[in-house]
Amino acid sequence: MLRLARPLCVQTVKASKLSRLWSRPAALMSTLLIHHPQYAWLQDLGLREDNEGVFNGSWGGRGEVITTYCPANNEPIARVRQASMKDYEETIGKAKKAWNIWADIPAPKRGEIVRKIGDALREKIQLLGRLVSLEMGKILVEGIGEVQEYVDVCDYAAGLSRMIGGPTLPSERPGHALMEQWNPLGLVGIITAFNFPVAVFGWNNAIALITGNVCLWKGAPTTSLVSIAVTKIIAKVLEDNLLPGAICSLTCGGADMGTAMARDERVNLLSFTGSTQVGKQVALMVQERFGKSLLELGGNNAIIAFEDADLSLVLPSALFAAVGTAGQRCTTVRRLFLHESIHDEVVDRLKNAYSQIRVGNPWDPNILYGPLHTKQAVSMFVQAVEEAKKEGGTVVYGGKVMDHPGNYVEPTIVTGLVHDAPIVHKETFAPILYVFKFKNEEEVFEWNNEVKQGLSSSIFTKDLGRIFRWLGPKGSDCGIVNVNIPTSGAEIGGAFGGEKHTGGGRESGSDAWKQYMRRSTCTINYSTALPLAQGIKFQ
């Protein structure tokens, strides 16, 4: 699913060199994009050339300094001073104190605060969307849409704040009531990845807040400016409502900060979005202390198109799901299974559609396809294409690094591989689509389920019986099981997450709120009698 940024993606400078770095001559400082007139709007988000990456009611940071880069041209944007372990300890302490205030506020009033956060985000949606596009690399419409998703989740959470609760159940004993009580966990740690630096935090943050928790956020180092800008907006809302800023804290940092959160018993729930490999390490650290974790990990998603599929739906769905966000979505389609009777036609039409994709600067509203996030991602793309060729695949479209400033690669289609080729079962976070022929429903359902991940899946068919078999116990084993729509994109009203090596976590809608709370079963005796088991009586 979502990958954590690696250390290679950022320039790290020891804290001892901090003053020297931040007192560079003006000529050198002007190389940062934030100093260029066309990026002056960054200052409207409260950003500057040197930014503090810790917030716990006040801004600070005593850790290393990193520089974040624009994936479209690999130019430096600005610098961020990350959290030290001392900053982390101070932030945890302040967050815990803030919880004592936040937990006493009635849930509907907490919902009102979350609604105000959504309103504040809405006012900055264009600027934040541009920042997401600049620092992450996704096209502008996707960057704005991601902020809109956070706004929508705030609206959803505000309504949900009046509905959370447990049932009253029939008691077996006369004069007794049986009920469920739901209470907040306390401190929710949120570790997000680079590819959705706003929305995934929003899913967790909005629901965690209305359920009575405080939050500590560690975003990906390569999208630190997004984390800071979003936190500044939230902090203003909290300040205006006379609430402690530590209700929504931030500690920018790398793997050391994530490890500290995973091992810290004071973090009552850790929501982690990233690779399966790192997620497994996180899960083991949290489980070792009998903590709670919410994992959103790898996805190796498939679309299946049967002989009766409406190709006017299949083609745009496959295109959108394969190349959207340059193949860096957790729900990106990576495997396309086509019935043998339509395989050749669909591949030819897909190749034609790929040739019309407009590539360029992601903040240009006319562009549909932007860069990969880092140079490392480009290297992984090249390696995957070569592995696919060695395993018998044929690149029928793309497959090369583009001669373009930044981290651009060609959207790629590969045919001729067997369904269980090693490269097919390996998730590569890049726009590579593996296409296969199949003969019948039974075999293709098995192929869909044979990968270790289980996030998203979709079939295209008009056969009602097949649709319900797909949705049933012998159909898709994924957490998202679609019909006649792409694998990518998810409505906030449904629970988002996957099975198997995807981690089993659920975020956003439906009853995902339960993961942020603890349940108590309560028996209340409102009579004067005390019936005991097995008919025991006290004389």
Swiss-Prot record:
The active site is at E296 (proton acceptor), C330 (nucleophile). Keywords: Acetylation, Cytoplasm, Mitochondrion, NAD, Nucleus, Oxidoreductase, Transit peptide. GO terms for molecular function: aldehyde dehydrogenase (NAD+) activity; betaine-aldehyde dehydrogenase (NAD+) activity; identical protein binding; L-aminoadipate-semialdehyde dehydrogenase activity. (S)-2-amino-6-oxohexanoate binds at T331, G489, A490. The modification N6-acetyllysine is found at K86, K94, K97, K462, K500. CDD domains: ALDH_F7_AASADH (cd07130). It is an enzyme of class 1 (oxidoreductase). The keyword Signal does not apply. It holds the Pfam family Aldedh. Its EC number is 1.2.1.31, 1.2.1.3, 1.2.1.8. It is found in: Cytoplasm, Cytosol; Nucleus; Mitochondrion. The modification N6-succinyllysine is found at K86, K94, K97, K537. Homotetramer. Belongs to the aldehyde dehydrogenase family. This is Alpha-aminoadipic semialdehyde dehydrogenase. It comes from Rattus norvegicus.
